[in-house]
A protein has these predicted regions:
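Alpha-helical cap/lid subdomain in secreted, periplasmic
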Residues: 201-345, 349-368
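Compositionally biased, intrinsically disordered or flexible polar/acidic segments
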Residues: 1-161, 167-170, 329, 338
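Short, structured coil segments at secondary-structure junctions
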Residues: 92-94, 179, 252, 291
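Conserved SGNH/GDSL esterase-like catalytic core that processes O-acyl groups on lipids
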Residues: 130, 140, 144-150, 155-247
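Residue-level detector of flexible, active-site-proximal loop/helix-junction positions
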Residues: 104, 155, 190, 263, ...
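Short, solvent-exposed polar/charged micro-motifs at secondary-structure junctions
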Residues: 16-19, 193-197, 306-308
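Conserved beta-strand scaffold positions in the cores of enzyme catalytic domains, especially
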Residues: 6, 183-185, 292-295
Length: 368
């Protein structure tokens, strides 16, 4: 029997079959669910018909935790307010964007279903937005969902909350996919195609991935580094390591997809973007043809985007912040490699565009 959890939020009576959650329901290990900080939660009861719709919690950048076994889950969120419009953003641990500013008119109630991947036996859902609401939450195991595994570096990874607004494009990809697909982001900061394998990270994916899943592979930023644990030669060892990812996926009937490295933000004097990856990009393109692996040329797509924005405006995509602009960077930050959240959203959209253009089927069917 499929395990499921059903929660009714607010201060009215609980709906049949649902567990009641109020603004006083704090997380306790023995309980296994609750808000991690109830000071950021209020509750209202509009005293209208329908026990799920009449009352709600208002989570002002608040997180709700449910202890669950590792695996894939479909979550369905009910949102609405009888008398006020609402607008809610939902992220899953850590910082994976599931939906953004979901607007619901006053008197309406909507359900939004999304898929999540849990690795640490805890599902943490963070609600924010201009006027957030949560009326109901259903969590159901989804063992038959398609997994989209990501292997890559810091430009792809789920960046930690204490680095906000740092974000990898893999964090933003879930909002672009229907609930049939779960994004399993195994990308890790500082890794090259070589060190990712030598640390056992590819093996961890191979142990999980199944037939008809996908493995997206983006390396190159750190393969250029000269230290022995990470460096690969672009025409030889770089290709050899990338082949291991492709072979690992194909061995179980999964589908590998190569992604060229997203560009850094460095411009020539003539306004053209400087290519800091050089032969690594061409090697990925060559390998795609040699092994008949679908290719998303994110390097070319990001080049066009950055050049269109120009040297100054493109800063808005990257971690460029004045002193005091970002809470975790009081002295400011100037980073031409890593994205802030809005930039990662734009790059994830380019990846989704690449899925369509490369006719990666049936994955392309599940794009929103």
């Amino acid at each position: 029997m499929t395990k499921a959890w059903k929660f009714d939020f607010g201060i009215g009576d609980a709906d049949v079959g649902y567990t009641k959650i109020t603004d006083k329901t704090d997380y306790l290990p023995e309980r296994g669910y609750g808000f991690t900080d109830i000071s950021r939660v209020t509750a209202r009861d509009r005293k209208q018909p329908d026990s799920l719709k009449r009352d709600m919690c208002i989570p002002a950048d608040a997180s709700f935790r449910v202890d669950v076994p590792n695996g894939n889950y479909m979550i369905t969120v009910g949102m609405g307010d009888w008398i006020l419009p609402s607008c809610t953003t939902l992220k899953a641990n850590p910082g994976r964007l599931l939906f953004h500013n979901k607007a619901v008119t006053a008197g309406q109630y909507v359900k939004e279903s999304v898929a999540v991947y849990v690795r640490d036996e805890a599902l943490i859902l963070t609600f924010s937005g201009p006027v957030p609401r949560i009326n109901a939450l259903e969590i159901e195991a989804a063992p038959n969902a398609i997994n989209l595994y990501l292997a890559g570096d810091s430009t792809v990874t789920d960046q930690p909350d204490n680095g906000f607004p740092y974000a990898g494009w893999g964090q933003m990809l879930p909002r672009l996919l229907k609930h049939d697909v779960v994004v399993a982001n195994h990308a890790e900061s500082g890794r090259s195609s070589k060190s990712f394998i030598n640390e056992g990270r590819l093996e961890a994916i191979v142990q999980e991935i199944k037939a008809n899943d996908y493995l997206f592979i983006q390396f190159g930023h750190n393969d250029q580094k000269t230290d022995e644990p990470r460096y690969t030669e672009p025409h030889t060892t770089y290709k050899e390591y990338l082949r291991q990812y492709i072979d690992g996926a194909r061995a179980v009937g999964a589908h590998p997809v190569l992604v060229t490295s997203v560009h850094r933000r460095f411009f020539e004097k003539n306004g053209q973007l400087k290519d800091t990856h050089g032969p690594y990009l061409q090697s990925v393109r060559e390998l795609s043809g040699e092994l008949e692996v679908p290719l998303i040329d994110l390097a070319e797509k990001s080049k066009r985007l950055f050049e269109e924005l120009g040297e100054e405006e493109s800063k808005s995509l990257f971690m460029w912040g004045a002193p005091g602009e970002f809470a975790f960077f009081p002295n400011g930050v100037e980073d031409n490699t890593h994205f802030q959240e809005q930039g990662a959203i734009r790059i994830a959209a380019l990846v989704a565009e690449g899925i369509r253009e490369a006719s990666i089927w049936p994955l392309s069917m599940y794009l929103r």
